């Protein structure tokens, strides 16, 4: 069993984070796996202090403890100096970067977190995984079964999955667009196609007008560029 705990939330202290992670570790027992995600909220000094304390819970890895690739690289060096052996995973530093390869060039991470939708699809992620050469964790945003199925397809296509995928976010939605949603059973997801059901989803008139205006603006701008 694997659990991810969000840390470094604006309203929380390090003591709060330690208490939550300890509770999760106790619930999973010594054989469960615990990972934490700071979403880039710490500076290097904060991250070093926090990870030194969190390390006693036998973390699988710390995801995006700092915002920039340079900070992640500095943090890994400083963790090694003080003898703290905790993996660093890069998420935002890959999917929001113009050059994801800098994570490897600067030795900024031990693990790559790949999300299909923001990275441009399954094939793009497979190419990126090969390019990075790091152990991969396939993860998702808060998506319907249609999006989760793409993540499952990526996971199935990778030669190795050393860590559990982070694809159980469908439970955070109140409903799904698929008649036969992907549901985790015994810690696993089926590899299969998922199609939206027959239920219609209609935007409000206000939202529809906003998007139509946005489309017209974009098309007008594209036409001006093409006419130069």
Residue ranges and their predicted role:
Residues 142-228:
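Flexible C-terminal active-site loop/helix
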């Amino acid at each position: 069993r694997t659990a991810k705990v969000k840390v470094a939330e604006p309203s929380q202290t390090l003591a709060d984070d330690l208490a939550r992670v300890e509770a999760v570790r106790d619930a999973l027992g010594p054989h469960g796996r615990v990972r934490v995600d700071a979403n880039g909220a710490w500076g290097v000094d904060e991250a070093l202090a926090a990870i030194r304390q969190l390390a006693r819970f036998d973390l699988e890895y710390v995801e995006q403890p700092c915002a920039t690739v340079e900070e992640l690289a500095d943090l890994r060096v400083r963790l090694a100096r003080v003898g703290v052996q905790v993996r660093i995973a890069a998420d935002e530093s890959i999917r929001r970067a113009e050059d994801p390869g800098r994570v490897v060039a600067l030795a900024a991470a031990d693990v790559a977190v790949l999300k299909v939708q923001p990275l441009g699809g399954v094939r793009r992620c497979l190419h990126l995984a090969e390019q990075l050469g790091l152990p991969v964790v396939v993860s998702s945003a808060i998506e319907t079964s249609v999006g989760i199925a793409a993540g499952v397809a990526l996971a199935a296509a990778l030669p190795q999955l050393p860590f559990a995928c982070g694809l159980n976010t469908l439970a955070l939605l109140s409903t799904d667009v698929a008649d036969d949603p992907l549901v985790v059973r015994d810690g696993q997801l089926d590899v299969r196609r998922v199609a939206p059901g027959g239920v219609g989803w209609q935007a409000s008139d206000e939202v529809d007008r906003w998007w139509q205006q946005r489309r017209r603006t974009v098309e007008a701008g594209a036409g001006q560029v093409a006419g130069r």
